């Protein structure tokens, strides 16, 4: 079995693959202060809960956009799994033709998503990932990673509104009854949700205009189902796109090792 870890700024998503099947997955808070032992005990509990042991795992791959956490995670893998993890970063084989000015600037999460997206859905392709930041990735019909856009995530914007406007409360991100809010909470929900729907439709439409062949639009991340339910511009919601990409990269980089 392969253990995959997608470390984001807010949450870390973990998964266990048995062949091509995602057998188990979990979402935990990303903590920069946890030690290797704390991570080890937490992951041990998650594995044990589904009847697995450290020894059931034969390979590990990690994608992270939080560099300070990597030391603890790498040491945890060595200490508890007795496995040196594969890290998504410089030197890893991706198969991507990256046309960024500096390819090293492309985040690990965006690379992993692109690998999975091309494998599952072909090209051209636009991938929207609703995380701490909302990222847009454009892959052309030649499977070249051309770049994209990065915007503040919906939660960042919501928290900023709460923090900067004294009379506005902290709210849950949810669909309001009407676009015309009748109270402060519903008005904020309408502005946040439909404001983001408008952002997605605007950016994706402009990216689509760059392609002679209509690209498929894939959304992933925690809020993807909510946003997609309010817009026809998203073709597919794939909640496990990043985990799939990690599995594919693990296979690509270990296939000669058996």
Swiss-Prot record:
Q: Where in the cell is it found?
A: Cytoplasm
Which reactions appear under catalytic activity for this entry?
Answer: (R)-pantothenate + ATP = (R)-4'-phosphopantothenate + ADP + H(+)
| Cofactor field | NH4(+); K(+)
Q: Which residues form the signal peptide?
A: none
The cofactor binding remark recorded in the entry reads: A monovalent cation. Ammonium or potassium.
- A Pfam family that the UniProt record links to this protein: Pan_kinase
Summarize where substrate binds, as residue positions.
100, 107-110, 184
Instruction: List keywords of the entry alphabetically.
Output: ATP-binding, Coenzyme A biosynthesis, Cytoplasm, Kinase, Metal-binding, Nucleotide-binding, Potassium, Transferase
Biological processes per GO annotation: coenzyme A biosynthetic process
SUPFAM superfamilies given in the database record: Actin-like ATPase domain
Family of the protein in this entry: Belongs to the type III pantothenate kinase family.
According to its UniProt entry, what is the function of this protein?
Catalyzes the phosphorylation of pantothenate (Pan), the first step in CoA biosynthesis.
Q: What protein name is recorded for this chain?
A: Type III pantothenate kinase
Gene coding for it: coaX
